[in-house]
């Protein structure tokens, strides 16, 4: 298996995408938090990831690069072009999965994380999986329960036993100088049409 970022024909996969509006770009630009690749190292101690993974909110590639080093083929896109993957792709307007890919893994912008999960479940195949890095507080919320958890709960929840750094605009140096992370995170794994309650473990 080759380590590679996706450089295929964007027109064939995302041909129905329209131009993203300025408000959407501003929103995500202000909601960009790069994830410490150690999050992937922790996840793979308990969960086996598939060979091909779609990372639709790739940022500067912190998660994607780690996955590639582990031997995965990563299709990396983002609404904002931050110098990695394919920029200018609004995931909420993507209408099908990349070829031979059944897994979406990302740290979505928190303000639209619910919409991203719901959309991922719409475009994934029946045997696909949606792996989301989220704040632990994402577990609560009336709207999330009504629109997501009551209809398609996660199959697995992996709670981090130690704090993981997510640095605004990828500035890990400033975050470390400030004492690291004060926020709790987890991975949620969803599968389309799941009705069973999740199992929880710690990583």
Task: Place the predicted regions along the sequence by residue.
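Class I S-adenosyl-L-methionine-dependent methyltransferase catalytic core
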Residues: 1-203
């Amino acid at each position: 298996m080759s380590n590679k970022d996706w450089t295929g024909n964007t027109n064939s996969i995302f041909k129905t995408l329209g131009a993203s509006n300025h408000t959407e770009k501003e929103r995500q630009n202000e909601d960009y938090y790069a994830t410490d690749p150690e999050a992937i190292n922790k996840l793979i101690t308990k969960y086996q990831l598939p060979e091909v993974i779609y990372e639709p909110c790739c940022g500067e590639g912190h998660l994607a690069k780690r996955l590639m080093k582990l031997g995965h083929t990563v299709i990396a896109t983002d609404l904002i072009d931050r110098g990695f993957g394919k920029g200018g792709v609004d995931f909420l307007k993507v209408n099908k999965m990349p070829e031979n890919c059944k897994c979406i893994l990302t740290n979505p912008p928190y303000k639209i994380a619910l919409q991203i999960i719901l959309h991922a479940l719409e475009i994934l195949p029946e045997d696909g999986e949606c792996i989301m890095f989220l704040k632990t507080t994402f577990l609560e919320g009336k709207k999330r329960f009504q629109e997501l958890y009551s209809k398609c709960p996660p199959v697995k929840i992996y709670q981090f036993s130690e704090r993981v750094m997510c640095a605004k605009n990828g500035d890990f140096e400033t975050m470390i100088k400030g004492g690291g992370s004060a926020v709790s995170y987890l991975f949620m794994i969803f599968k389309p049409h799941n009705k069973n309650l999740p199992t929880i473990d710690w990583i």
